[in-house]
Amino acid sequence: MLRVVGEPRHIDRAIKRLQGALKGVPARGVRLTWRGGELRTAIHWTRDDSFWWAFEPRRARDGIAARHALLLGYAPDPPTKRESITCEINLPRAGTDRKVAGIVVADANGALYLAHSGRMGGARSGQRKAGFREFLADGVWRKVTWPDGEESEALIVAPLDSPRLTRLLGQFVDSVRRFKAGEPASPRSGLCVAPMQVESTVTACDRRLVDAALHEELAKRGLFGGAHDLFSLRGVRPQPLFALVADGRADELALAVGSLSLASARNGPDIRPILIAPASLADGDAALDALPFACVRFRWRGARAVFDGLDDALEG
């Protein structure tokens, strides 16, 4: 289980890692507004991930300890001189504080993660602060242990050592934007095999990026048939059924192959099983090449997953 860390050196390490990973085009003298306040500061726009960010120190007040505030705003276009804050992640400078939503957690190996309690302020009228948990049900939610032994659930935003940290943070900002705008949660697809529940936290975060990239590629091909099932084709048979192997562990691969084989036996020509596997695992693997269904390789191009052979697999 992940544990909440409050040691100043760990928090400083987390802040330095965030500041080192977050780049972007600077925009100075920007007026940032939120419900009940505003400030003027410099922000940085990460164009490829559609958000801007800024760090601001916050003094102790109203029983809340001094903290680092990571201000975030959704920005598919270059920021203007006035921007609205989509959300902020507050991290105590030392110790732990359940009154703020930002959390730094560590795994058994000492790797650090940026996490969020899931309580989301500033939402629309009628939205519960706990409603974000329901909205982002497919997020990477994990049990965490506090120094006093209490346990709670937190959303893992990103592993702080991940080369894809910025992309994961952008994904979080977009999720918050959609939630606060009152958009419906993305429905779960009935045409994707459910992932293993025991996969590592790092793998689970990467899996969401691969899922999102696959979704975009299928959308480009006009393959979506409606709001109820994101992966349904417009009455076309066979329907694709995807199983994703995110990191290539033997048990994960066995589950994916077994699930596709069973689904194929049950549904016959009505489905087209497609295995999605890392190129590092799939390239030159005779066993995967011998499978009775297509294997699409994915590889990382920067922070984006790209797929080799997807069109051939869809066409059969």
PLM region descriptions:
Residues 294-313:
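Charged, structured surface patches that assemble and position nucleic-acid processing machinery
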Residues 36-75, 126-159:
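Generic detector of solvent-exposed, compositionally biased contiguous segments
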Residues 80-94:
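Short, hydrophobic/proline-enriched secondary-structure or compact coil segments at domain edges
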Residues 94-98, 104-150, 246, 253, ...:
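Nucleic-acid nuclease catalytic cores
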Residues 133-221:
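The feature marks a conserved, polyanion-engaging helical scaffold used by nucleic-acid processing enzymes
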Residues 1-61, 180-226:
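Acidic-basic catalytic patches of nuclease active cores, encompassing PD-(D/E)XK
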Residues 77-82, 232-242, 267:
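Active-site beta-strand-loop-beta-strand hairpin of nuclease catalytic cores
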Residues 238-240, 248-267:
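Mg2+/Mn2+-dependent nuclease catalytic core
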